[in-house]
Amino acid sequence: MEEMEEELKCPVCGSFYREPIILPCSHNLCQACARNILVQTPESESPQSRRASGSGVSDYDYLDLDKMSLYSEADSGYGSYGGFASAPTTPCQKSPNGVRVFPPAMPPPPTHLSPALAPVPRNSCITCPQCHRSLILDDRGLRGFPKNRVLEGVIDRYQQSKAAALKCQLCEKAPKEATVMCEQCDVFYCDPCRLRCHPPRGPLAKHRLVPPAQGRVSRRLSPRKVSTCTDHELENHSMYCVQCKMPVCYQCLEEGKHSSHEVKALGAMWKLHKSQLSQALNGLSDRAKEAKEFLVQLRTMVQQIQENSVEFEACLVAQCDALIDALNRRKAQLLARVNKEHEHKLKVVRDQISHCTVKLRQTTGLMEYCLEVIKENDPSGFLQISDALIRRVHLTEDQWGKGTLTPRMTTDFDLSLDNSPLLQSIHQLDFVQVKASSPVPATPILQLEECCTHNNSATLSWKQPPLSTVAADGYILELDDGSGGQFREVYVGKETMCTVDGLHFNSTYNARVKAFNKTGVSPYSKTLVLQTSEVAWFAFDPGSAHSDIIFSNDNLTVTCSSYDDRVVLGKTGFSKGVHYWELTIDRYDNHPDPAFGVARIDVMKDMMLGKDDKAWAMYVDNNRSWFMHNNSHTNRTEGGITKGATIGVLLDLNRKTLTFFVNNEQQGPIAFENVEGLFFPAVSLNRNVQVTLHTGLPVPDFYSSRASIA
């Protein structure tokens, strides 16, 4: 919580925000501080006069204004809350933090109201103290900026957790400790401000003044004020404008500038932005965790450098002492070089520790602040700051990348003393710098969210650990045989993603990966278990088909442009398991005899399926069918096909059999036995036939029952 305090303090006064308002650039200011840094612009630079000169622009949001006109001399400077001035760097009186500070244009009225509520001079300009964007106020003045109720709630909870003394809300300079609180005005006063702004007379005499602690409790228990529309102060926010990214009321939708914009429900957008902020925080939290581990690593490096330095110096002294008196003259010089290298390494590491510590503290503070903001139940107030917080979180997360978490210095001393020269060559003795042997790479991490299987293919992805400093020259991916057997290499290369095809269906595979470089190989990663699909989904393969084959229906339907038989294969091959697919006859003219079955990848494509020794098929006409392999015709069976008929093909590689079905009835005996190897579904047909393929089908129930009995 302490690191969040920077998020809760005004950049102008340095104190906790009091009645904060939100500028169009998403930064916050105390309302009183905003009045103190107002600048009155000449009449000729007002938005009205600039629009009259013909150089005005339409109502852009502040990001577009920033891009288009922040440094443009012809910019009108008019926006939805006002506009950015065209010359934000105009020199004028400045506070220590570079913010332009001018005294109020008129003294605050001697009333019990805050000076920030007094009228704002016409043609006033305000510069954000953080991004230094200048903004010309419209007729509403500071009332045109929404109040940050969420930030007020976070500050109140923070002060309660710290038991901080409540400060006066009306002190113009350093706020004094409050002595009372007015329950009606909801304002904390010190004694001088109470006497000046809240005298016990007139209508104020009836107000109830209580101790600050009691007032804090009553304020916490009382319902928080609902945020109202800046354009229609009597209306509460009811919807969210997607284009302008801001809450709006119903009057804005009916008659205001949001009437033609896309709007969404306030509650739905509140939940959506909370979800987006939470997701962004998850990424930033991971970065912060890595940063903490990185700092531990850096601090360990300091100790290792100290230890290695001591060890190296001792070795150096021992070698120098062995080279008699002549070595003593060089010993001092060599020790000086070692110490210089030692100090250089320490300086680099300590500088990096300091830099990362500051960045981590800022990151932690932003995280704690965002977590407190998420606890708020004010949708309107939350949506006013959520976009800016989400951008800050993403920006902070990005800043932790780009090599930030990589050590700038190694712990080893890349020096080696060569003590072989003769005594008369001692004056030439010097360090010989050698490259230290590089360690093996760290163990790769399999990225489970990117690993998947499809049909009989598996895609695996991996990465190096985030804190690894040793580069890998490549990776070796290994899979077992799907039956718990030995692992075998399936990929060797530099890529961190690989797709393995041709696996068995309905099988479980174990995968692992290791990295290698010139020094050696890393340990294996954790083993990942992959399950391939139980049934196959596939289509016909245009790449391997005869050129006369015509494809349609996403390659599930085929016919032919020739009167001769032509062969087309399926995209998926089978070498293990039980597989079943069907083909429906969409068109059947002039009683042709198409063939259905399986084939090797190199089957002849310009003749009927089964005429060579690379295919096993059943060809059928309108009356009967035959089985055919290597041009041998067997098992003539009565019963043919017509339009609408269904051909089923059952390939059982566990029992090494091929069986055919016509209209859900087995056609003849088992067609072929002792079939083994890699088979592709296959069809041969001519222009008189059109068939459609149906895949992903379970094995017929009667066959499953018969197989279990057998």
UniProtKB/Swiss-Prot annotation:
InterPro entries: B30.2/SPRY (IPR001870), B30.2/SPRY_sf (IPR043136), Bbox_C (IPR003649), ConA-like_dom_sf (IPR013320), COS_domain (IPR017903), E3_ligase_FN3/SPRY (IPR050617), FN3_dom (IPR003961), FN3_sf (IPR036116). GO terms for molecular function: protein domain specific binding; protein homodimerization activity; SNARE binding; ubiquitin protein ligase activity; zinc ion binding. Pfam families: ANCHR-like_BBOX, fn3, SPRY, zf-B_box, zf-RING_UBOX. A zinc finger (B box-type) spans 163-212, 224-266. The modification Phosphothreonine is found at T41. It is an enzyme of class 2 (transferase). Zn(2+) 2 binds at C229, H232, C252, H258. The modification Phosphoserine is found at S44, S46, S49, S53. It is found in: Cytoplasmic vesicle, Secretory vesicle, Synaptic vesicle; Synapse; Cytoplasm, Cytoskeleton; Cytoplasm. It catalyses: S-ubiquitinyl-[E2 ubiquitin-conjugating enzyme]-L-cysteine + [acceptor protein]-L-lysine = [E2 ubiquitin-conjugating enzyme]-L-cysteine + N(6)-ubiquitinyl-[acceptor protein]-L-lysine. E3 ubiquitin-protein ligase which ubiquitinates itself in cooperation with an E2 enzyme UBE2D2/UBC4 and serves as a targeting signal for proteasomal degradation. May play a role in regulation of neuronal functions. May act as a regulator of synaptic vesicle exocytosis by controlling the availability of SNAP25 for the SNARE complex formation. The coiled coil domain mediates the interaction with the N-terminal t-SNARE domain of SNAP25. This is E3 ubiquitin-protein ligase TRIM9. It comes from Rattus norvegicus. The gene is Trim9.
